[in-house]
């Protein structure tokens, strides 16, 4: 939940106006809006490049994934894996824009371990995939922007671990 939503809900629960401290936290959040939007735009505009690089890194590190018997063996399985890369990158942009991990949790992480386990997808492999996605994405960002985006990737990695 964004800072703005949190402040409004808290104040409303207590039937009061937001305090000056709460208003300052909203102001600080708003001041980071340009940066958060820039990061999300960069990730969205470079999705194809990021996904291609992450895929390349993952296959180089784990060729067993695309070898016969691997979970990404064959064109269909590989396409599904690449699709998931794009989906997770989109989740990251939602978190960055909101300045909060809640969209990632609500939209993407509830039940993800169970889903992958039921499909026979090794969760440790997904963790490696997200780590590759993180590296490919952060390599396109400035150090400051990478520091802002990194925790959202880490949140997904930790949730899957």
UniProtKB/Swiss-Prot annotation:
InterPro entries: Globin-like_sf, Phycobilisome_asu/bsu, Phycobilisome_asu/bsu_sf. Its main location: membrane. GO terms for cellular component: phycobilisome; plasma membrane-derived thylakoid membrane. (2R,3E)-phycocyanobilin binds at residue 81. Keywords: Antenna complex, Bile pigment, Chromophore, Electron transport, Membrane, Methylation, Photosynthesis, Phycobilisome, Thylakoid, Transport. The keyword Thylakoid applies. Contains one covalently linked bilin chromophore. The keyword Disulfide bond does not apply. Coiled coil: none annotated. It is found in: Cellular thylakoid membrane. One of its GO terms (biological process) is photosynthesis. Belongs to the phycobiliprotein family. PANTHER family: ALLOPHYCOCYANIN ALPHA CHAIN (PTHR34011:SF2), PHYCOBILISOME 32.1 KDA LINKER POLYPEPTIDE, PHYCOCYANIN-ASSOCIATED, ROD 2-RELATED (PTHR34011). Allophycocyanin is a photosynthetic bile pigment-protein complex with maximum absorption at approximately 650 nanometers. This is Allophycocyanin alpha-B chain.
